[in-house]
């Protein structure tokens, strides 16, 4: 099959990319603004970190139900509903005056963001053939790291010059713009069904009950390995990403704007790396899980180098290296999710794996905060996570794909 994208495919991929991008801009807005808001509202570092944890609690509650809903009622409804809800909750963050109120809002933001990734991956599975998915998912997943670049590119600047409330209000407007685009471009189309025939063989049926769906994803060896891998790898990625601004400001004593600029470079490196590795994976014979294991293993030394950077000028080198290490594996692992799942269970499978991803992302800030409390050192806290990508790489090497 021709590997180039049609105009329709390009349109749907752009919309999915923007939707997932904004889900990360909403998520990361707090990480970018945390040093400023903590000071303005007199929050402790642990209170600020608990806002990250609250988001992941809410997110983890809805990733699996979101996948089930996308399989049964369609990804279009999931995407449109999430965009509107994310805009409302993020706008309300501008009204936070108490710790408890903000904590509830962050929890709600996690709940309404949870269904997005599963719905988008299901849409990619329908609209792109097996030979196109590495590139498509690579482009799609670039939005997560680009979200780091986007939010750090404007949020600290707006907060410093116009107030942190205005930064949240501007952030809240963005999903509404994409909502109107999605109304016209996101369609439920069962594409490339003939080319997917070999992927459906062995499932035994076209439609599964809720119990059968959960039983399948909970007992499939490849899916379970992907899930546990995600706990270690994704947890480390987002633990590092959400804590990096605080580390730079508190440990290296740089300004919030400088930290935002460094994290923008971090994100740009990941943006370039993701579609590049996806493009490569579509054109080499090495199985995707082995390629993913290699790039995930490299995440560990990249994190150690970043955590041991003492000269702020060296961050221009070590931050992009970390950005590539932290994100390059994700297009490959998400393409493997689509490949490992029957077409009718792609949303459920993505939600199941993402549930473990978010448990990891929920656990990582707790580990970081605990180590920080015990040692008083942000550097040691980051280094404590460096073993996790190695464990993830080992698990990826055990996957067996047809």
Regions of interest found by a model, annotated:
Residues 1-6, 190-226:
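Juxtamembrane intracellular "pre-TM" segments in multi-pass secondary transporters
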Residues 77-91, 289-304:
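Structural signature of the two symmetry-related core transmembrane helices
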Residues 63-74, 274-286, 372:
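Helix-to-loop junctions at the C-terminal end of transmembrane segments
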Residues 30-31, 221-267, 274:
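Extracytoplasmic gate region of multi-pass secondary transporters
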Residues 105-146:
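Cytoplasmic helix-loop-helix junction between adjacent transmembrane helices
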Residues 11-45, 240-245, 364:
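Extracytoplasmic
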Residues 61-100:
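Conserved MFS/SLC helix-loop-helix module at the cytosolic interface between two early adjacent transmembrane helices
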Residues 140-191:
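Helix-loop-helix hairpin linking two adjacent transmembrane segments in secondary transporters
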């Amino acid at each position: 099959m021709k590997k180039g994208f049609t105009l329709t495919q390009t349109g749907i991929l752009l919309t999915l990319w923007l939707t997932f991008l904004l889900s990360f801009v909403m998520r990361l807005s707090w990480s970018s603004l945390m040093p400023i808001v903590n000071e303005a509202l007199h929050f402790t570092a642990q209170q600020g970190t608990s806002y990250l944890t609250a988001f992941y609690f809410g997110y983890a509650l809805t990733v699996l139900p979101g996948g089930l809903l996308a399989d049964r009622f369609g990804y279009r409804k999931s995407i449109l509903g999430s965009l509107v809800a994310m805009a409302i909750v993020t706008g309300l963050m501008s009204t936070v005056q108490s710790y408890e109120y903000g904590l509830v809002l962050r929890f709600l933001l996690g709940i309404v963001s949870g269904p997005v990734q599963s719905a988008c991956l299901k849409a990619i599975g329908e609209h792109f053939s097996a030979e196109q998915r590495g590139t498509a998912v690579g482009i799609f997943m670039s939005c997560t790291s680009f979200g780091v670049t986007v939010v750090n590119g404007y949020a600290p600047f707006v907060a410093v010059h116009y107030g942190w409330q205005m930064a949240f209000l501007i952030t809240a407007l963005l999903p509404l713009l994409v909502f109107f685009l999605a109304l016209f471009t996101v369609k439920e189309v069962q594409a490339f069904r003939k080319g997917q025939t070999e992927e459906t063989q062995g499932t035994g049926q076209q439609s599964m009950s809720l119990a059968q769906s959960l039983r399948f994803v909970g007992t499939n060896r490849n899916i379970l390995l992907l899930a546990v891998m995600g706990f270690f790898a994704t947890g480390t990625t987002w633990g590092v990403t959400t804590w990096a601004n605080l580390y730079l400001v508190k440990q290296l004593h740089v300004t919030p704007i400088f930290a935002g600029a460094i994290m923008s470079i971090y994100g740009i490196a990941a943006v370039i790396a993701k579609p590049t590795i996806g493009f490569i994976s579509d054109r080499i014979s090495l199985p995707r899980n082995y390629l993913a294991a290699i790039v995930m293993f490299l995440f560990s030394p990249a994190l150690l180098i970043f955590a041991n950077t003492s000269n702020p000028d060296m961050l221009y080198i070590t931050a992009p290296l970390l950005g590539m290490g932290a994100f390059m594996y994700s297009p490959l692992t998400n393409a493997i999710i689509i490949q490992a799942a029957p077409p009718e269970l792609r949303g459920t499978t993505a939600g199941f794996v993402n549930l473990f991803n978010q448990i990891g992302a929920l656990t990582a800030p707790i580990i970081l905060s605990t180590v920080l409390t015990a040692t008083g050192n942000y550097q040691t806290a980051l280094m404590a996570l460096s073993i996790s990508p190695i464990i993830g790489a080992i698990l990826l090497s055990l996957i067996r794909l047809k």
